[in-house]
A protein has these predicted regions:
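N-terminal secretory signal peptides and thylakoid transit peptides that target proteins
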Residues: 1-19
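C-terminal segment of N-terminal export signals and the immediately downstream linker at the start
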Residues: 3, 25-62, 143
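Short boundary motifs at domain starts and secondary-structure transition points
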Residues: 51, 133-138, 225-226
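Residue-level detector of conserved, well-ordered beta-strand and adjacent loop positions
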Residues: 52, 64, 76-78, 132, ...
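Short polar catalytic/cofactor-binding loops
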Residues: 53-56, 82, 150-152
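Extended acidic/polar, glycine-enriched regions
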Residues: 71-141, 153-157, 161-162
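Active-site neighborhood of divalent metal-dependent phosphoester/pyrophosphate hydrolases
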Residues: 139-159, 164-244
Length: 244
């Protein structure tokens, strides 16, 4: 049975019904939800934004543009979600050789500080991401969300949506199996066929283009986009990143 209510429509409904109440509580969260539901944003940034590998004074920022004719991507890092206090900015060239992705290592940052970032390409601005550097010294608390074994066809990434909306989370620690290499006959294939989440490409991934396509599919999931926009990721690998 196919779901009658697509995830994009769910997000649009969330803006008016409070279905994503955790994100709707903040100005930044409302901007993210509006951007993810915006067709123009999805035309250029259908895989969203992400951050990760934080240190006490740096963090990696990422995006992928979905329009092949746009090669210059600009970025901003700010102390506020309105980007009134931009602390770093720049531009980066991208293209087919790097699958139209952009990676920025923002350096010389303050420990334990929250930042907001966004990208611009083809006249369109991405959803604003929120990230954070690692703290220094003794801590009263640290909020970690733990994720693992994210098999796209086996079900929707609603746990990612919960993580995105949790204000107590500082970082997401993903313990591996961020993707699964299976083809359309692998574990979870029956469930995926039932709910309309079949692996792409349909065969087991073995080459660079296969992996790019599979990662792009996982990054296009709404829950994944919300989680990556909300929190920086600290990742370890397990076996399914390459092969079982």
């Amino acid at each position: 049975m196919h779901l009658p209510f697509p995830r994009r429509k769910f997000l649009k409904a969330a803006l008016t019904t409070g279905a994503a109440s955790g994100l709707l509580l903040t100005s930044w969260g409302r901007k993210v939800l509006a951007a993810v539901a915006n067709p123009e944003t999805n035309r250029v940034f259908s895989h969203g934004v992400a951050s990760g590998d934080p240190t006490h004074d740096s963090v990696l920022l990422w995006t992928r543009i979905s329009v092949a004719n746009s090669k210059t991507v600009s970025w901003e890092l700010a102390l506020d979600s309105d980007f009134a206090r931009v602390v770093q900015s720049g531009s980066r060239e991208t293209g087919q050789a790097r699958d139209h992705t952009v990676k920025i290592i923002a350096e010389n940052l303050h420990p334990g500080q929250s930042y907001y970032y966004r990208f611009r390409a083809d006249g369109v601005v991405s959803e604003p991401g929120r990230t954070r550097t690692l703290p220094e010294g003794s801590l009263a608390r640290l909020g970690l969300a733990i994720a693992s074994c994210s098999n796209f066809p086996f079900g929707f990434f609603n746990a990612y949506e919960v993580i995105a909306a949790d204000p107590e989370v500082d970082f997401v620690l993903h313990l591996g199996d961020y993707i699964y290499e299976y083809g359309s006959d692998g574990w979870g294939a029956d469930e995926g066929a039932e709910i309309g989440r079949v692996h792409s490409p349909a065969h087991e991934i073995v080459g660079l283009e296969d992996y790019r396509q599979r990662h792009a599919q996982y990054k296009s999931d709404v829950g994944s986009r919300l989680m990556h926009a909300a929190h920086p990721l600290i990742c370890t690998w397990d076996d399914h990143e390459s092969t079982n």
